[in-house]
């Protein structure tokens, strides 16, 4: 029993930061979930595991990964968060110009609205899924996106797309392989990423899984778009099957991430991606039931 208790405590303890500026209690620094207001609210950087770092805001996850061939950044947050992201990267002791590759999850302004700004500051190359390329090049939402009418109010600066990577494709960067998993649940171009992170003899597969929420504009009805529903369900199955020792999500609240990074909840938990996908599946079923009842 003592050994089990010690194991539970160690699994919840925050990793000691190994770089200046890294926080051991990002949850306290951010405070209670503020929703939309947190999307550009500065947060201190925090260690995730080994060479992976949280450099996002209080409401939007941005992940920085060290490799021997340079840095990789996944997502940027909205445009007004870009200066905070760059500041967090510098606080960890990195030069943003060390970023060589930019990856992304959904093609929405809250997660990649700052991509053009970060790209200009770093010169890094942007990799996208096929169905996200149009939105990133134009700065405008895909008309097939259930949130298109909402997203039209928040156009993004067009970004330079350097590489289009299909689902299952990967990038080998400095010995770390980043694999793209298309999961068009939240948006047509949604993508999740997995990579291996080793700390000493402990190696984990990190899954940065895109949102499982099927959100839409008020006048959009999923039960009138069977192809979109089928795509969303396929995306949920993809997330359920991800290799997933450690789950990250684009909105930290989607996986209690800030508490987990602060040692207030276990960083890892069994079947995390499967549980995350199941919650999204339940919400989609509830949405379809409400639409059916409103007919």
For every predicted segment, state its role.
Residues 16-44, 283-294:
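N-terminal pre-domain segments of enzymes
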Residues 256-295:
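Binuclear metal-ion centers of metallo-dependent hydrolases, dominated by the metallo-beta-lactamase
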Residues 1-10:
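Bacterial N-terminal signal peptides
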Residues 51, 65, 75, 85, ...:
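Divalent metal-coordination and catalytic microenvironments
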Residues 38-92, 96, 192-214:
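Conserved beta-strand hairpin/beta-sheet module of binuclear metal-dependent hydrolase folds
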Residues 27-30, 34-43, 76-80, 138-152, ...:
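Acidic/histidine-rich helix-loop elements
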Residues 71, 78-80, 160, 170-172, ...:
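Metallo-beta-lactamase
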Residues 52, 80-83, 90-170:
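Active-site HxH/HxHxD metal-binding segment of metal-dependent hydrolases
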């Amino acid at each position: 029993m003592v050994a089990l208790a010690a194991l539970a405590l160690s699994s919840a303890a925050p990793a000691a930061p190994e770089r200046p500026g890294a926080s051991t209690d990002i949850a306290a620094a951010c405070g209670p979930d503020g929703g939309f207001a947190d999307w550009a609210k500065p947060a201190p950087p925090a260690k995730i595991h080994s060479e992976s770092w949280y450099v996002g805001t209080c409401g939007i996850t941005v992940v920085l990964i060290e490799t021997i061939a340079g840095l990789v950044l996944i997502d940027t947050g909205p445009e007004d968060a870009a200066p905070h992201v760059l500041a967090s990267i510098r606080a960890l002791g990195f030069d943003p110009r060390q970023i060589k590759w930019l990856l992304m999850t959904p093609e929405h302004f809250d997660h990649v609205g700052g991509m053009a700004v970060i790209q200009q500051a770093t010169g890094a190359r942007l990799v996208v899924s096929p169905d996200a390329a149009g939105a990133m090049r134009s700065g405008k939402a895909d008309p097939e996106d259930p949130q298109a009418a909402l997203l039209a109010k928040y156009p993004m600066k067009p970004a330079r797309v350097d590489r289009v990577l299909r689902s299952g494709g990967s990038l080998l960067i400095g010995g770390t392989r980043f694999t793209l998993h298309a999961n068009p649940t939240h948006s047509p171009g949604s993508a999740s990423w997995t990579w291996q992170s080793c700390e000493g003899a402990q190696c984990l597969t990190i899954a940065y899984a895109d949102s499982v929420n099927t959100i839409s504009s008020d006048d959009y009805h999923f039960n009138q778009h069977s192809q979109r529903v089928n795509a969303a369900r396929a995306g949920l199955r993809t997330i359920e099957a991800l290799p997933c020792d450690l789950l990250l999500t684009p909105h930290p609240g989607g996986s209690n991430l800030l508490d987990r990074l602060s040692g207030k909840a276990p960083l890892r938990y069994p079947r995390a991606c499967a549980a995350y996908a199941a919650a999204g599946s339940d919400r989609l079923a509830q949405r379809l039931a409400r639409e059916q009842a409103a007919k």
